[in-house]
Regions:
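An acidic, carboxylate-rich microenvironment
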Residues: 10, 40, 62, 115-120
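PLP-dependent aminotransferase-like
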Residues: 73-132
Length: 132
C-alpha cells in the first residue's frame, strides 16, 4: 500500500499557470539574480512581516551563513564559540557554522521523539547559540 507523504503536484497544481508565467518572465528579461522579482519579493515580504529590510538569498545555507555573520558583526558571537545543533541536522547547518569560524557541537536527539532533550546537560561555557 502506497501512502503519499507529500503530493507536491497536487499542492502546486492550482498555482501552475502563475508559476509558468513568472518563470517565463524571468527568462525573458534575463535577470536571474537581483532582478525586479527579487526586489518585489523583498519589498512585499518586508511589508507583510512589518520590518524595514528583507534580503532574498538563494538557499538556506546562504541564509544561515548571513545570520551567523550578522551575529559576529554585532559582537554576539566570536570565533571559536560553540553552537549546539541536532546530530541529524542537514549539512547546511554545519557549513554555516564552520564558515563563520564557529564550532558545531552535535547533540543526538531522543530516538523516540527526535527532540533535543539532552540540550541542557550539553551546554558549556563555550556554548553561545543553539540552532534547532
Amino acid at each position: 500500500m502506497h501512502i503519499p507523504f507529500l503530493d507536491l503536484n497536487k499542492i502546486n497544481l492550482r498555482f501552475e499557470e502563475e508559476f509558468l508565467q513568472a518563470t517565463q518572465q524571468i527568462i525573458r528579461n534575463g535577470f536571474f539574480v537581483l532582478g525586479e522579482q527579487v526586489h518585489t519579493f523583498e519589498s512585499d515580504l518586508a511589508e507583510y512581516i512589518g520590518c524595514e529590510h528583507v534580503i532574498g538569498v538563494a538557499n538556506g545555507l546562504d541564509a544561515l551563513t548571513l545570520i551567523f555573520r550578522g551575529y559576529k558583526e554585532l559582537g554576539l558571537l566570536q570565533d571559536g564559540d560553540e553552537v549546539i545543533v541536532p546530530a541529524n541536522t542537514y549539512i547546511a547547518s554545519i557549513l554555516a557554522i564552520t564558515e563563520n569560524g564557529l564550532t558545531p557541537r552535535l547533540i543526538d536527539p531522543c530516538p523516540n521523539t527526535f527532540n533535543l532533550d539532552l540540550i541542557e546537560e550539553n551546554i558549556s561555557e563555550k556554548t553561545k547559540a543553539i540552532l534547532h
